[in-house]
Amino acid sequence: MTLAPLDASKVKITTTQHASKPKPNSELVFGKSFTDHMLTAEWTAEKGWGTPEIKPYQNLSLDPSAVVFHYAFELFEGMKAYRTVDNKITMFRPDMNMKRMNKSAQRICLPTFDPEELITLIGKLIQQDKCLVPEGKGYSLYIRPTLIGTTAGLGVSTPDRALLYVICCPVGPYYKTGFKAVRLEATDYATRAWPGGCGDKKLGANYAPCVLPQLQAASRGYQQNLWLFGPNNNITEVGTMNAFFVFKDSKTGKKELVTAPLDGTILEGVTRDSILNLAKERLEPSEWTISERYFTIGEVTERSKNGELLEAFGSGTAAIVSPIKEIGWKGEQINIPLLPGEQTGPLAKEVAQWINGIQYGETEHGNWSRVVTDLN
């Protein structure tokens, strides 16, 4: 028997009877308010994907023994839609999110889907709530696709039932008053990811264990953890973001933008990939090297002492870039330069402008922006 694929053409739409009015931009807080509708699609091992539904935002009803609650059969994505300067609504590189979502699903034995079908369905969901997509630079619609195992029973095995759902949240800028550089605690006593694990997948199970180390770092005055790994204390990620550092060779004067390689312990960030692509295109090759390589907290410390550490920042969907001003390590502070009178370094500022320009339709870059609807 052939299992039914996820099919956007079969979507059933039920419109809310209680449409919301858009909140003022000043009231938009990440993850606190949601649009009027949600997308759901059930899957069974016997039949495959059922009819997708767009319906009023509502609670889910699950058996208390559902495997998602007991064995963490759960994964998610984070992506955004933007209202552009020419009054269109676009999604930013959704194909990358769908590819990563399928990889996550395969890793924990949940069903996969045709990426284009889910992109189409998410587009239909956004169209249903298009009036709630906020307008203005820094404002966007955060999209949270989620896939959970819903099999009822306490046995640990491959789920034979699953639920795909998507909810959306109008959000404002990560930094409401401009960049705010953060202090990090280099963390070697807790591990975010390890070889053979699933640190490169967007599983909920990767996030909860990182909260306690973050609280511990916060108690010492740091905003986030700089995750280290292995006997050499390789730098991996910062908080829930990919990490970038900028070094300068004191002999040649050439600068290097470096981030950790995708070795299975690093999340394949969409923003990370975008930064690497744009840096290779737009930075002068005679002045810059773009590297994906291992580097350690020891190297950062040494290059800071030699005046070769120019900048550092995290990257992710929520903030695009998060400038770093200080790293605490073994009782010492590594100070990272910022632009005079600003809370960012020069490259982080430039990178944010590059990506914002594409997201808000000021510049084009291949097929990175996928039009959902034209509001003109």
Curated annotation (Swiss-Prot):
- Principal cellular location given in the protein's record: cytoplasm
Q: Which Pfam families match?
A: Aminotran_4
Give the catalytic activity. L-leucine + 2-oxoglutarate = 4-methyl-2-oxopentanoate + L-glutamate; L-isoleucine + 2-oxoglutarate = (S)-3-methyl-2-oxopentanoate + L-glutamate; L-valine + 2-oxoglutarate = 3-methyl-2-oxobutanoate + L-glutamate; a 2-oxocarboxylate + L-methionine = 4-methylsulfanyl-2-oxobutanoate + an L-alpha-amino acid
Subcellular location(s) per record = Cytoplasm
Can you tell which superkingdom this protein's organism belongs to? Eukaryota
Q: Cite the EC number.
A: 2.6.1.42
Keywords associated with the record: Amino-acid biosynthesis, Aminotransferase, Branched-chain amino acid biosynthesis, Cytoplasm, Pyridoxal phosphate, Transferase
Q: What cofactor requirement does the entry state?
A: pyridoxal 5'-phosphate
Query: What is the role of this chain?
Result: Cytoplasmic isozyme of branched-chain-amino-acid aminotransferase, which catalyzes the first reaction in the catabolism of the essential branched chain amino acids (BCAAs) leucine, isoleucine, and valine. Catalyzes the formation of methionine from 2-keto-4-methylthiobutyrate (KMTB) in the methionine salvage pathway primarily using BCAAs (leucine, isoleucine, and valine) as well as lysine and proline as the amino donors. Involved in cell cycle regulation.
| Entry similarity comment | Belongs to the class-IV pyridoxal-phosphate-dependent aminotransferase family.
Protein's UniProt name: Branched-chain-amino-acid aminotransferase, cytosolic
Species of origin = Saccharomyces cerevisiae (strain ATCC 204508 / S288c)
